[in-house]
Regions:
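Conserved catalytic/ligand-binding micro-motifs in nucleotide and anionic cofactor chemistry
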Residues: 1-192
């Protein structure tokens, strides 16, 4: 079949909540997009799915049908249906997977959410190990909380710029990145 369907599944496992969006267009699976809501707190998986649907389809076109697992609560589901109809200009049914093909897509999306959680947890563990190795190499007595790295660059000795990247907690903190134009300095002479 040449269906246009999005499959939205949620999974809470190993201390992570993942909402995975699988997109099917013209009957072809185009891929998955796992998302990890930052403000989910103690939300249920169904609440996280409902919040994702609200936010995602406010900015992206809705397909002909939306499969959700688990389905949002009944009251929440009717509000979502009305919102999607308003945004799309047509009815967009939010249903559970019933046909064999739809169940297979939903199961694949759930498995991909599980793999995304596993990959995220492994990356976090590796990052923790690297941070401990750095702490030992620098002989720091306390756990590293924040690292700021600066790089000074220039173009043929002119237009010197300092760039700062920041690591905080468990990852890079791009909101704290900075660039500084440097004035009134002796130009560099390393033309390598």
């Amino acid at each position: 079949k040449g269906e246009d369907i999005d499959i939205v599944v949620g999974l809470r496992e190993s201390g992570q909540l993942c909402v995975n969006l699988a997109m099917v267009r013209g009957g072809r699976h185009l891929g998955d997009r796992p998302l990890f809501p930052v403000n989910a707190g103690e939300s249920t998986v169904a609440e996280a799915i409902a919040a994702f649907i609200r936010q995602h389809y406010a900015a992206h076109p809705a397909p002909a049908r939306l499969i959700a697992s688990p389905l949002p609560e009944e009251e929440e589901g009717s509000e979502l249906g009305a919102l999607l109809a308003e945004l799309a200009g047509r009815q967009v049914p939010v249903v559970e997977a019933r046909s064999v093909l739809h169940r297979a897509w939903a199961e694949m999306a759930l498995q991909n959410a599980r793999l995304a959680i596993l990959a995220r947890n492994q990356a976090s563990a590796q990052q923790e190990q690297r941070l401990q190795a750095l702490q030992q190499a620098l002989e720091l007595p306390d756990t590293i909380q924040r690292i700021e790295c600066f790089d000074i660059s220039h173009t043929q000795g002119e237009a010197a710029v300092a760039s700062c990247v920041v690591y905080h907690g468990n990852g890079m903190k791009k909101a704290d990145y900075r660039r500084f134009n440097m004035r009134d300095i002796t130009p560099g002479d390393d033309y390598a």
